[in-house]
Amino acid sequence: MTKIVMLDYIPMLNNGGHRHPADIKPSMINSLLDSMSIILTSLCTFCEQLSLNEAIIVNLGINTLDQLLMSQAGRYLLLYYCIYALELYTVCYSTLSLILLYLIQLNYILLTNIVGYLQYSCSEIANLVYTYILLEGLLDVSELDALVVETLLDYLWVPCDLIIRYYRAYWYFEGVYFNLNIPYVQRSAYWLCVVIWNNIGWWTYQLMIIGWYSLSCLCIRLVPTILAIINLILTYIDLIIYLYDIYSNYSNMTWLGILYSTINSIIRYDISRIHAYQHLLTVIIPNYCLAIYNSGLILSSLLLDIYHYQIGLTILALQYLVAPLYISCSLLIYILCYIMTELLYSRSFYIDLLLRLLEIIYLDILVNSLISIIILILSVDVAYLIQLQVIILSQYINIISGYVAMPTTILITWYLYNIAVYIYYLVDYIATISTLIIWLLERILWVYGICANNIEPVVIDLPQLTLTSLDALLNQLLSEWCLLDAIMNVVTSVILLITVSCLGVLRIILFIAVYPVYCIGVLLLNTLLQVVVGLISYIIGTFMNAIILICDIYVYSIHRPFLPLIMYVYFVAAIILEPIIDIIHTIILAEHALFNTYCYIIFDILQPLHLQAFEFYRDLIWLIADLILAYIDLIRSTLVEGIISFIKWRLEQDFQLVYDICEFYLDEVKPRIIRYWNIYSRWVRFLIYCAGNNINLLVLLYVQFKGYTLPMIILFDLTRIQLYATIPVIISSYIYQGILQTMLIISYYNTLLVATLEFIQIWLTILSVSPEMLYTSTLGILLRSYYLLYEILLLEPTWVLFECLSTCVGLVELYLVTVETTVSNILIIDLILMEVLLEDIRQVATILTCILDWYILETCLDMQYADILLLMSSGLQSTVLNTIFDLLSLLGLLDETSIRFILELTVQVCTIPAALYSTIIYPYIVLVTRCLLYLPDVVQLYLTIGEYLLRETLYQLLIDWASCKLYSYNLYLLELYNIYYFWLSLLEKYWTFTYHIYNYTTLVELSPDLLISLISYIIDICILSLELLLEDIRWGSTIFVNLLDWYLLDTQLNIQYIDILLITSYSVQNTLLTVVFYILNLCGILNEISIQILFEITVQICTILATIYCTVVLPYILIILEILSYLPEIVQLYLDIGEHLLLEILWQLLIDLLYYRAYDYILIAQLLCKVTYLLYIVLEQLLLVIIDLYIYIIGDLLIIGSCHVGNHIIDILCSAENVYFLYFMIFIGYLLCGIFAFFYHGYLGTRGIFYLSEMIIMGILIFSIVTLYYNLKYHLALDIILGELALSNEVIFTNIITFDILSILGVLLVATLTAIILTFGVEYMLREAFAYNVLATLVLFSASIICFIVSYSFGLMIIFWEISGTLSLFLIDMYYARIRTTQAVTRTFALNRFGDLWMFTASIEIYSLCHNDALPTLFALLPYAQFNLSILGNLIFDFTIPTVIVFSIFSAAACKCAQFLLFVWLPDAMEAPTPASALIHSSTLVVMGIFMILRFAPILHLSVYTLYIMSILGSLTVAYGAILATQTSDLKKAVAYSTISQIGYLFTGCAFLAFRATLIYLILHAICKALLFVLVGYIVHMFGGTTSLRRMGGIYYIVPDIAIYMFILCMVLAGAPYTVGFFAKELIVTTLTNTSSPVATFIICCWIISFACTPFYLYRICVLPLFGRPRCSRRVFRNIVSPQSTYNFIDSDSSLNSLLHKFTNLITRWSVQGRFTNLLHLLLLLIVLFCGEFLVFLVTGLFGTSTTLFSDTAIDDSVYQLTDYYLLSYYRVRNIQLLIIVLFALVTLYITAINNQLTFNIIYLSVVLPILAIIFICLGHYFLVDFTVYIYNISNSLIFELLCDLAIC
């Protein structure tokens, strides 16, 4: 009955696959349950019958396993039970599969019953399978019939039949399946392994599907149902784990175990039965070993399949969230990988284990007969596994080799070179000192010998040499020698006396101690060098010999898959040699001068590579090869029976010699290799550690080495690549010699191995003929010798190889993870981009189709739209297709899916130009869709489409040309060129495409005939295109002739038509010739037909051109010549007619026509030269035409040559690059001017310094504006690298300057302020004695600031930082005679040095991190440098390197900008002259300090603590500066404290990263503060030098213009409503109010304090001196200013001033009465109190009264928009603001018009207002604000109209 059930359900599974749960009915489940009960009953019956049969077997007398195996009945009985068990297993499996598929539709009761059945049945089935495995392992089925085995295998048929069929096909292919000599035990066990594993995989898959659907469908059911399903899942997981344990137990019985059990069963018999096993040894055992080998191969492939299958299974398990199953699969993968690793790495262990087992048996005969075969089988098996692994590792082997060796090679070489250099200098220094001491001693001895009246020097006691003896020596010399000798000896004695008295006994002791040490050191150095050289020579020789042995054994063995692995081993050996050779080369370079004699010893290091060891092994190999070849020849030439005794005698002698040599190698050489290899392995591990820690700084470098491309990853700076590039050149000669010797040895080994194999084959033949040869001792010696050879040549290289692989495994894992992640991300992104691109192209195609429909319906062809469509189609076609092909070629995605995808894209792209000629859209799409699967058809399709498009395009071109569309012809012809280029490039890309397809798959192949037909087809298309072009040009010639006839009939000389003809003719001939030559060069079809066509085309083109030239251009040129011949008359005519006609006639004639045609003539001449060179042999008529044309062209060029050159020079000078170059040269000139004026100011004088500086500053301003225009228009930022200075390996000083928007704005600001202050300084200090000194210092000071601004390296910034700081000290110390000045300079110096200390701290950190000071390098590396600097064990702070650098820069800027607690020096700076104070306050503080923070803006966010400190410090400075300004009564110090307070705003803005707002307020504050200082200087000067506010007043009555200027400046600085200061400061306040940090409250409190104090000190600064009553004496007030004074700004004698004088007298009367003064003071106090910051806070909504003025959600960081709900409307705010500016300008113009002394007004009008306008316009352009809109709105405003009416009245 079970048989019937099986036949019912098995076909349903095999044929139908998995049934849908809805197809299964409850009746089928009931029958399945009945079948389950029958199965369980049969199972019990089987167990009972098994027990009965065991009893029957015992009764038959079969007590042992051997008896059961030897019994035929027992074998058939066991086979019957196995078949029955498998039948039950198959039925149970089918039943369980159906039950699992029906689980989703079951209810709770049925589900619980099924769970119980499944638990019982699964355990029973597992027991059955395990029983079968045990029984099958005991069977010997080799003698059974093959049909019985086939029946047994048929019962193992499972739902995974596809895998079984695959393996059957594989066995059939290998010729093993029908070999009856193969033991079926192994095959049956193998099939059972496959069946069990496939069942596990299928069950797992079903389990995941069922679990997923069960959880999703039953999640809304009752909890017991879900628990039952979970119980079912856990039960099946237990079943899988149980079956895996069974599989593991079975897999432990490896083929070695089976062989070992077989040998054990054989050797249990007596030795007397050995003869009975001769047949077994000669026939069965070799076949058995062959079966073991084949089974091992299949098992290896099975393990790999299991490995890959489990990877997919693991991913699927993760997707279905089955955690226990995932753990089981992961464990299984780990165990399988471990098994493969053991098989890969434990070959020597298996061999040793087998040898030990065989040594226990004491059967020499069996050992001598089987050992070589077993070793061969094991090596082949493991070799196959290694081959599988090498396929994976071969792609990364070369990278790993460079990865390991190269980084530390360079590092060690560099350090050794430095050490050698230092030793050289040390030795040189010691030698110099020793030489000096020796010379002194010799001199002493010589003098003392003369003193003793001895000619030869005598040995004396050195301590006896005293001053007394020297005096005696001097006296004796004077008495005995002549005067000259006496004088020389006196000089010598004096030198000796000075030397002895200064150095004394120490130098003598030094000489006595150093000289012997020096001699001993040189001796030791020579000895040590010789020892090291000998040791290195021995190590290299030994190791290279070992590597060569590895190459010999593996490269030319029968296992060729080892070749990539052996090349890797050889490259490792070459890399090992490189460090040693680098060390030698470095020593040679460093010590060449002192140790030249040692070079020969060093070069002898590589001698063992080709002299000693090679000769020894070569002789040894030739000896063995000669012996074996002699034996082979002897065996081949004589009879086997007659030479057996001779062979025995020779073998005993010769192989004993080989055996002794091998034993000597094992005893002597092998320990040395092991010791040297241990040293090398430690070295390699260190290299891996170094490379692993620096993985982020690796650079990929390709080095071509002897035909092999070796990618090596090196670890060193890019600047050292040039140093290392010489290393391969040095070592190439030595490596090449090693390669030659290695190839020679490999050839020797090849001969040896071939002879050995032939010898073994013949020897096996001998053994099969004469089995008694097994018992001789000669064969035992032979086999032991081979065993030793295998141990030497096979095992040791394997050990070395796996040591290398084990050391590189860490790098392989790291590299694979990185590459895998990167490639996967790139593939995902590119696929998404391609999908988006396809959708985009579809939309564009739809849009263009609509446009074309509209275009076709139009009655008149509008050329503009046609050009647009052509350009769009051409651009899309070329760009999109090239991008797609490049992406697919790079990523290797050229499979079936990508072919379909790219064809779809091509259809979409090519539909656009095809729609222009609406006849081929439908055929094209049909053809494309027809050829989606075959590549040759696709290529043919594109060629067909190309021809069709070409014909249609040319036809359309002829129609358009016939319509006289001359301009469009050029575009159409370029479109033709693009189409040609597109199809040719497309064909080239398809060649590449075909190559990739041919490499990766074998589905598509291009036959040679097809390729030839494709090429011929291309040539036909090109010839056809040339014919069409010729026809096209003939049409064009006719049209041109008609046009020229029409032109000649015209009476007027129309320049426009001439331009049309010239441009068209040039475009036609240039484009056509380019297309023709390009096509001919690409296709190579310069045959007779193409030359004829080309000639006709050229004749037509040149005829057109010559006709146009002769009929149009030549008369035009003759007219020009005639005009030029009457040049004097023309000049007189120009004087009469005027400048307008001059520009309209002569300039337009020469420049607009001839200049633009000259370059065209040159190109025409070049093209015609090419044509002439090709055709001058055949065609003489064309030569005449070309010669005539040349005559006209040369005449034309002679006329316009000078004009062309001049305009070309102007264009060169006006280009952007030259603007930047001239800009840089002006900077250098200004710096040199400052240096010259500072050191040689006496040659120039005050006026010379002033005029020279002002001229250069004007140039700087002009070029700054031009450069700013280029930067804003083209978004440029030019960086100029002036060179590098390597102070050491770790410190590289880089000279970089930059011209970006920030630096140019800074230069504009500083230059403007310098010009203002220099003009003011000349007038202010005209009567000072040291005025030139002040001006020279100011010029150099501003030059250093400008250089600081444009510097883009930290080293340059430090240099100019120090220069400017030093010059500021010079400026402060001008009145050095004053005590207060000296004290001020001291305090300023101390605080500046404190800031410089922080700058040097930042430089140390930057050089230690980046090794150079370039700011781009710092900005790139600093975000990734998170190295902690712990202070007090992290109890206080935990700083990082970016925090230290940012804090140091902030601290330096805080010192320079006089922040809180660091502002003491700023009031002291008021001791300087007023011009110096103005420049210091406006430039040094504002520009340098804040500019440095803005320059380092990209890294400020890396230190949050620094930003908090900066915001707190800036807020304290704001409040404290304002408080101090209210308390001081000194005018200059009040302005200084106001500067401190205002800079606090800038610091706070930088702390909140509002850099754009900070930059705007920086420029505004600098200009206003500089002008304020100028006005304060005038006021102080007018009051006789007093600065006390208590002694000032009434300035408005005397000089009202100064009062107006100062009042406006104070309002701007205070932030009066609708002024620039109001909006600039509001940007910073808005940033603060939008911040929710805990520091914001404290900052707001500080700012409120400042806002409260600001009106008071501005009131005191502005109102008291200007509008207050005069507080000085009448004499002083009377003598302040006279109308004729230099500093009077109003001329009282002017008639225009009467109204102003009346108004002044009125004010004076009111002032005397006191009414107007009080009212004016009250009004100004109210304005100052309620202006500025309070109104800003009010508008921004901080006090809850209104909304913010600017939008919080702006489009950009720098673009603020106004909305409708604000307090004031947008245009009203802007109009009122600009109205104030216009009123201010009108007042200035009025004052200028009525003033005689225009000094200050000229400054303001010529410098300040233009610069302010330019800066605001540039900033508006930068912030996307259009000021023309505001001007337009002002012109339309009612207030402006009213003002104009008043002005007219």
Swiss-Prot record:
GO terms for molecular function: NADH dehydrogenase (ubiquinone) activity. GO terms for biological process: ATP synthesis coupled electron transport; electron transport coupled proton transport. The keyword Signal does not apply. Its EC number is 7.1.1.2. Keywords: Hydrogenosome, Membrane, NAD, Translocase, Transmembrane, Transmembrane helix, Ubiquinone. It catalyses: a ubiquinone + NADH + 5 H(+)(in) = a ubiquinol + NAD(+) + 4 H(+)(out). It is a multi-pass membrane protein. One of its GO terms (cellular component) is hydrogenosomal membrane. It is found in: Hydrogenosome membrane. InterPro entries: ND/Mrp_TM (IPR001750), NU5C-like (IPR003945). It comes from the Eukaryota. Belongs to the complex I subunit 5 family. PANTHER family: NADH-UBIQUINONE OXIDOREDUCTASE CHAIN 5 (PTHR42829:SF2). This is NADH-ubiquinone oxidoreductase chain 5.
